[in-house]
C-alpha cells in the first residue's frame, strides 16, 4: 500500500526512501525530503518547509551579483538551496551541515541538477543537541573556504542554535571569508531572558540584537539592513566594515 504521509521508515533507510514517496521523482526536478529530514531542518511540515525556503531564496537573490559564490552554513536538506539551484548567476554554492543524512540527500538530489555548481559538505561538529559524537568544536571551527572569497554567507536559523563562543567564532569566520562587497544574511531569536545577552541551549538560543551586532562589529562586520521579523526570526544583513 502506498504511503500517504511524509513518515518514513527506520534511520537506516536508503536515501530514496527518505524522500516523499507518494510523488515520483521527476526528471530535472528536486524531490521533497522526508518528514525526518525536513524536521532536522526546522519543520516536518512540507508547506512551511517550502515557504521558508522560498522566502530566504528571494532575499538572497536580492543581494546576488553575477558569478556569485555562496556559503550556506547550516544548510540542512537544501531548504533554501532548492530554490537557488536554477539561478544561473551562481558560480558556486557550498552548503555545510552537521547532519550527514541531509548532506548525503542534497548531494544525491540537488547537486547533479546544477552541474556540480552546488556541493554539500558534512561537518562533524560536536553538538550536545544534534551531534553528540562530533569531533569538531564549533567555537574553533574554520569555514573551509578562502579568505575574501564569498559573495553571500547564509545563516538561516543558524545563530538560533549557537552558544556564545560558537557565535563569536562564526561571526569572525564570516568576517574572514566575506568579500569586501559581500553580504551576510543571518536570523536569530532576539528575546533572551531578562538581563541576559544570551539565553537558552542549543535547542533554542536567544540573543539580544544589540549585543549580537556588537559581536559582529568586533568581527569586522556592520549592519546594512534590519529586515525585521522574517519567518518568525529577527533577520539582519551584515557587510564588511569600510576599509577592511
Over which residues does each language-model region extend?
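A conserved beta-strand element that flanks and buttresses the S-adenosyl-L-methionine
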Residues: 154
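Conserved acidic residues
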Residues: 68, 151
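Short catalytic micro-motifs in class I SAM-dependent methyltransferases
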Residues: 157-158
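A short glycine-rich, Lys/Arg-flanked "PGG" loop and its adjoining helix->strand segment in the class I
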Residues: 168-180
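Conserved S-adenosyl-L-methionine
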Residues: 74
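Class I (Rossmann-like) S-adenosyl-L-methionine-dependent methyltransferase catalytic domain
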Residues: 1-67, 77-142, 164-169, 183-244
Amino acid at each position: 500500500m502506498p504511503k500517504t504521509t511524509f513518515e518514513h521508515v527506520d534511520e537506516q533507510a536508503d536515501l530514496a526512501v527518505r524522500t516523499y514517496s507518494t510523488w515520483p521523482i521527476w526528471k530535472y526536478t528536486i524531490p521533497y525530503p522526508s518528514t525526518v529530514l525536513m524536521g532536522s531542518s526546522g519543520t516536518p511540515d512540507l508547506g512551511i518547509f517550502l515557504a521558508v525556503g522560498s522566502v530566504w531564496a528571494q532575499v538572497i537573490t536580492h543581494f546576488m551579483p553575477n558569478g556569485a559564490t555562496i556559503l550556506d552554513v547550516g544548510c540542512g536538506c537544501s531548504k533554501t538551496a532548492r530554490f537557488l539551484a536554477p539561478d544561473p548567476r551562481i558560480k558556486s554554492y557550498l552548503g555545510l551541515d552537521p547532519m550527514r543524512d541531509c548532506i548525503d540527500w542534497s548531494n544525491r538530489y540537488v547537486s547533479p541538477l546544477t552541474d556540480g555548481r552546488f556541493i554539500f559538505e558534512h561537518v562533524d561538529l560536536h553538538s550536545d543537541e544534534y551531534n553528540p559524537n562530533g569531533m569538531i568544536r564549533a567555537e574553533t571551527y574554520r569555514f573551509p573556504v578562502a579568505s575574501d572569497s564569498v559573495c553571500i554567507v547564509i545563516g538561516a536559523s543558524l545563530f538560533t542554535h549557537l552558544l556564545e563562543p560558537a557565535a563569536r567564532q562564526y561571526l569572525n569566520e564570516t568576517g574572514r571569508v566575506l568579500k569586501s562587497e559581500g553580504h551576510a544574511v543571518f536570523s536569530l531569536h532576539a528575546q533572551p531572558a531578562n538581563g541576559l545577552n544570551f539565553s537558552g541551549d542549543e535547542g533554542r538560543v536567544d540573543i539580544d540584537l544589540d549585543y549580537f551586532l556588537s559581536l559582529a562589529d568586533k568581527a569586522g562586520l556592520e549592519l546594512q539592513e534590519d529586515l525585521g521579523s522574517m519567518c518568525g526570526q529577527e533577520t539582519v544583513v551584515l557587510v564588511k566594515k569600510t576599509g577592511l
